[in-house]
Amino acid sequence: MELRNRKISLNHKTVQRLMKELGLVCHVRMKKYRSYKGEVGKIAPNLLKRDFSTTAPNEKWVTDVTEFALFGEKIYLSPILDLHSNYLVSYVISDRPVLSMVMNMLDAAACQLPLGAAPILHSDQGWQYQHKHYQKKLSDYGITQSMSRKGNCLDNAVMENFFGLLKSELLYLQEFDSIEHFKRELIEYLDYYNNHRIKAKLKGLPPAIHRQQALSAA
């Protein structure tokens, strides 16, 4: 957090190397939540096909779940990113990886859709994304479902990169006193990411401003 507040940006590999040299450890473990439980519902086709390019907001969204382990407990983050600006459309933080986590995430994202927008929403083949209630809600919102091929994380590379960024900029540079402290810092980081963290590919703008400019120009 201190490096971020001072607007100092470091590559995550540099952070890892320096931590190793100094004998520092990360006190929070972050890993991909393994949600695949076989074909428990309908598998959607891979419509995204690693084409992460867009011409406007709300064309292509991606989602996934990541898991944090600390103080003997687990916390789950379920976000949706818009590929046009890498904007965090919505997210839910949950103590358990239940269906309501992704349903609430989807509701929050759909509320932001302009009239007539019909994005693709890409995910892995996790059980919650195969669930009939989730798929019905996608249909109700006019969102087209896309899924990665089984066991192929590169099909959702943008989300994987986002989780890597989160790990390097929050977990490696911060210690936490409690679960609640971690949650507060996580929420603060996600706000910083959307509204303040500039990206070179967005012409030096943070995702929220780039997105707003694109929506205004449409």
Residue locations for each model-derived region?
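An active-site-proximal beta-strand-loop segment
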Residues: 54-89, 95-96
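Acidic/histidine-rich, metal-coordinating catalytic segments
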Residues: 115-130, 149, 205-206
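Mobile genetic element proteins and their domesticated derivatives, centered on retroelements
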Residues: 15, 19, 48, 64, ...
